[in-house]
Structures are given as C-alpha cells and as structure tokens.
Amino acid sequence: MPVDPSLVGREFPAPAPLTVTQERVGAFAAAVGHPGGDVPPTFPIVLAFDAMQAFLDAEAIDLHRIVHGEQRFAYARPLAVGDELSATLTVTGLRQIGGADIIATASEITDATGAVVCTGKATLVHGGAA
C-alpha cells in the first residue's frame, strides 16, 4: 500500500532529547570505525534516526521495508560532548516509482537553546507490503 501523500509537510519529533556524552560518542565511534576524539560528523544520525523511527511508528511503516537511499548533513557548528540535542523530522516530498515510495525527509537538530546545530536530508525508499 502506498504511503499517504498527505504526509508531506508533517513533522515528527524524536521522543526525547539526547545528551551527547563521552560514552555515547565512544560507542558510536567504535561502531563506525572513527578514531575517537571529537564527536564524529555522522553522530547526528543517532538522533535523526529516533525522529525517523517516530515517523515510521506513527505511520505503521515497517523499517524492514525501507532502503536508505541518501543522507546528507549540513552543520551550523560542530557537536560537542555536553550538548543536549533534539530532532524533528519533516516529510518534504513523496513520489511513487515502480511500486516504491520515494520519501524525502529533512531533520533539524537543535540544542537546548533551540539553536539549529545541524540539518539532515535523507531519501528513504519504501517497498510497500511484502
């Protein structure tokens, strides 16, 4: 079943803020093979994924039917240990190609003051029901 086109423009916040800790950074760095030290530039995916999961859950879309097509980040400033971050995903586009839904999203990552730290754009390919 295709994804509802009225989703375009809807926002899905991550369920809770995330505090960037040295332990989280270390675990993420080890998982992705980053040498450690500063917060890896791909770390925002942790929070962006929480917002994406909120979208998938709200719309009853099975993560196992999603292929991650593209991901980009643009930074207003580097992330740092101690940052408390929140994320909101917005569905920015939707089209169907060959029976698949191509879902464009934008995630805004903000700090505790509400300042934008990072924005992410992703393309998700939804294969529909099995």
Describe each model-derived feature in a short phrase.
Residues D62-T88:
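Mid-chain, well-packed structural core segment of small domains
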Residues M1-V3, P78-A130:
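HotDog/MaoC-like acyl-thioester-processing domains
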Residues M1-E70:
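Hot-dog-fold acyl-thioester-processing enzymes
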